[in-house]
Structures are given as C-alpha cells and as structure tokens.
Design a protein with these regions (language model features):
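Residue-level signal for secondary-structure boundary sites
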Residues: 11-13, 58, 94
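Short, well-ordered beta-strand segments in beta-rich or mixed alpha/beta enzyme
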Residues: 1-6, 35-64
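An amphipathic, aromatic/His-enriched active-site/gating alpha helix that lines ligand/cofactor pockets
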Residues: 21-34, 53-87
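Short, surface-exposed ligand-recognition loops at beta-strand->loop->(often short) alpha-helix junctions
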Residues: 6-16
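Residues in well-ordered beta-strands of folded domains
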Residues: 4, 87-89
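Short, low-order "capping/linker" segments at domain edges
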Residues: 89-98
Length: 98
C-alpha cells in the first residue's frame, strides 16, 4: 500500500511529529507490517509518502481499526490539505536480502 499525504503549507513537520508520536510505535509493534517506509517528498515541502507492506489484507484492515491509527486519523485531518491518496498494491516481486 502506498499512501500520499499533502499537508497544509508549512505543516509537514507537525504531521511528521504526530506520526512519530502515534503511529511509529504501533508500526514497530505490529507483526502484520513486513516493511514500512515513511518518506518526505524532496520536491514538495508539503508532501509525505508512506509505503506499507503487510503480511495480508486482513493485517492491513486490522491496522486501520487500531486505536492508535484512529486517533492519528482524527488528529492529523486538520493538518492536511486533502484526504490522503491511497493505492493498494499486490507485491509481485520482492528483492530478498541474502
């Protein structure tokens, strides 16, 4: 899953701080997340993109119901310029570490 956020002007640091407070610990403790990348857009000072690789579709749905995620969603909404753009992907090839 790829989630692209567009923050209100000059609010990206606030969104990042909220993500680090609410979601980073939850992601670290979530066995359903096989990988999670949180990235700041180099070309857009208000852009954030998260790449999430879940073990299963059920794990993704479970995470979206987690109390920390629901709290984050409520708190971050006023800081965003628009609703996040969500793309669901089916991994078809993954580079494995050797």
């Amino acid at each position: 899953m790829v989630v692209a956020h567009k923050t209100l002007p000059n609010r990206r640091d606030s969104v990042r701080a909220l993500w680090e407070k609410r979601l980073a610990p939850t992601v670290l403790d979530n066995p359903g997340h096989l990988a999670y990348y949180y990235g700041l857009d180099s070309d857009d000072p208000d852009g954030i993109t998260a790449f999430q690789h879940y073990r299963s579709a059920e794990d993704a749905l479970e995470f979206l119901r987690h109390p920390a995620y629901l709290a984050y969603e409520r708190e971050v909404a006023p800081l965003l310029a628009a609703a996040p753009e969500v793309r669901r992907l089916v991994p078809t090839w993954i580079k494995k570490e050797t």
